[in-house]
Amino acid sequence: MPENTVEGFRSALAAGAEAVEFDVRLTADGVPVVVHDADVSRTTDGEGLVHELALADIRRLQVRGENAEMQVPTLAEALVAVAEADGGADIEIKNVPGDPAYEADRESVLEATLVELERTGFAGPVVISSFNPDTLQRCHELAPEVPTGLLSIDAVPPSDTLEVAEHDGHAFILPSVRALLGGVGVVAEAHANSVRVGAWNADDPATVRRLLALGVDAVATNDPTMAHAVRTAWLREGGAGERAR
């Protein structure tokens, strides 16, 4: 299933995922939509920057993939679909330096996301995640009850991410798989300090097993059917992994 689509979320949750991860950006007219890239050309049949397109423009786009009927969903549509499947949501806020839509002095994407969470009454488990610590700090100010997760790239040691998370009060650290597997003792240290650990992305059985062996709390994957099967087998064998996502 194509990424960041309602159909993809339903498929992942039906395959055994407990939650889905998706990315949120704002249209030119301020509507939060679920799309990863700043430019729509990779994932749809259109072109242009999300923040320069109105929702009506986004609605005319078709998501690339086997099913040409899929569209870019609004955040509200995504939340309703996830709630109907009794799933959770890891919502990544796209507001980082270097992004064409980056706002250094505002958090419009975050604010719109929090409004939609309240308006839709989404009651499933939720985490607001971002690579931008300032975004997460603003989330604490606006909605202290919402857990936050700090994302980090390959080049950032997970121990550094954990240090920031402990200082800023984040519920999760979310390093890349490569970085986490290269770290020593980070998962145990995080758990000792009441911080949970997820990793992105694990798309083969061996990697999922290695992460489960480390005791991670969540595994982000593009293949939920595979990850769920590996986790099920791991638990059957007496493993200590908690959950695959």
Feature roles, as predicted:
Residues 1-245:
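Phosphate-group recognition and catalysis centered on beta-loop-alpha active-site segments
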